[in-house]
Amino acid sequence: MTMSISAVILAGGQAKRMGGADKGLQLLHGKPLFQFIYARLHSQVETISINANRNQTIYAAAGVPVFGDNLEGFHGPLSGILTALERADSDFVLFVPCDSPFFPDNLLEKLKSAVDFHGVSIAYVHDGEREHPTFCLMARSLKGKLATYLASGERRMLQFMRQNGAVSVDFSENKQAFTNINTLADLTYFNQQKDFSGFIAK
């Protein structure tokens, strides 16, 4: 199936487990996390933007389009996803969280293959042990259903995905590539590593 695809880096959360710090702007080897994400995405998709509800001018200074959630307050990643779908010109949007800088170069390829093969509107990552719904490829056509879902008070990503026929895609061969930097302790640990060869997918 021929489809147009854009990508969005999800950086709109409150980062409670990081003491409220803006995750995407935390430095890893001297570079903001979101720039690691952007670099890995750029080899897979041409049109990339960032969903951020804070520090938008800082993100925008990197030359990447930035947008906040249309819904007021912090409603979780689905709120940013809804706004992304509402503003998208592409048929599908690839979503990636801002705290996972090691994801594989074949992320889009495998998710798109699953969407094509199964004829579904959503495909997301499973690393063999855990589901990673914020790594997903989602059809713009779901924006109406997602708006209704959020208006009902629901916030659970996997529930929405399952209700809409999502398929999980096996990335167990690259499980370590979905390691996320969730806390300040995680950030300290990774900043102490000389390189990330043990995490970045081959």
Model-assigned labels for residue ranges:
Residues 2-134, 140-154, 159-178, 184-198:
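Nucleotide and nucleotide-moiety/phosphate-recognizing core
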Residues 202:
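Cytosolic-facing loops and C-terminal tails of multi-pass membrane proteins
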